[in-house]
Amino acid sequence: MNMNATLLGQAIAFALFVWFCMKYVWPPIMEAIEERQKKIADGLSAAERAAKDLDLAQANASDQLKEAKRAATEIIEQANKRKGQILDEAREEALTERQNILTQGEAELETERNRARDELRKQVATLAVIGAEKILERSINLEAQKDILDNITAKL
């Protein structure tokens, strides 16, 4: 019977130990396990969200990159068009300036030609009067000389 009392004592001690563990030890362990499971589940869902966010961000980045390339291409095309316009305007302006310079040069040349022609006429008239004076060996008065020069100039 000794053995039975010992066995019964051990069974009671074991039952008290189990009750004590279930009352005070088991709940914090279960709470820690549940908290750990929750953290793991939250981590997995966060990883899934992060993966989805990454995919979305990559898609957005790809779209933005495409949009940026399109915008850059459009800007380059506009710049090329503007370059062509500027070159055309500069070409037209240069041609207009060239024409103005040529017209001005021709006008100056014509003016200079007329001035030289008038100067030559005066010199020829003066030489003719001097020659005529020498031929006639007489001096013509200044008023008569002026009239003769004007007549000769007008005829030339």
Swiss-Prot record:
SUPFAM superfamilies documented for this protein: F1F0 ATP synthase subunit B, membrane domain (SSF81573)
InterPro entries associated with the record: ATP_synth_B-like_membr_sf, ATP_synth_b/b'su_bac/chlpt, ATP_synth_F0_bsu_bac, ATP_synthase_B_chain
Transmembrane segments: 7-29
Statement: the UniProt record of this protein carries the keyword Lyase: no
Membrane topology: Single-pass membrane protein
Chief site of localization: membrane
GO molecular function: proton-transporting ATP synthase activity, rotational mechanism; proton-transporting ATPase activity, rotational mechanism
One Pfam family recorded for the sequence: ATP-synt_B
Signal peptide: none
Top-rank taxon: Bacteria
Keyword annotations from UniProtKB, A to Z: ATP synthesis, Cell inner membrane, Cell membrane, CF(0), Hydrogen ion transport, Ion transport, Membrane, Transmembrane, Transmembrane helix, Transport
GO CC terms, sorted: plasma membrane; proton-transporting ATP synthase complex
Subunit structure: F-type ATPases have 2 components, F(1) - the catalytic core - and F(0) - the membrane proton channel. F(1) has five subunits: alpha(3), beta(3), gamma(1), delta(1), epsilon(1). F(0) has three main subunits: a(1), b(2) and c(10-14). The alpha and beta chains form an alternating ring which encloses part of the gamma chain. F(1) is attached to F(0) by a central stalk formed by the gamma and epsilon chains, while a peripheral stalk is formed by the delta and b chains.
Similarity comment text for this entry: Belongs to the ATPase B chain family.
PANTHER family, per the entry: ATP SYNTHASE SUBUNIT B, ATP SYNTHASE SUBUNIT B', CHLOROPLASTIC
Entries under NCBIfam families matching the protein: ATP_synt_b, PRK05759.1-2, PRK05759.1-4
Function field: F(1)F(0) ATP synthase produces ATP from ADP in the presence of a proton or sodium gradient. F-type ATPases consist of two structural domains, F(1) containing the extramembraneous catalytic core and F(0) containing the membrane proton channel, linked together by a central stalk and a peripheral stalk. During catalysis, ATP synthesis in the catalytic domain of F(1) is coupled via a rotary mechanism of the central stalk subunits to proton translocation.
Name the record gives this protein: ATP synthase subunit b
Organism field: Aliivibrio salmonicida (strain LFI1238) (Vibrio salmonicida (strain LFI1238))
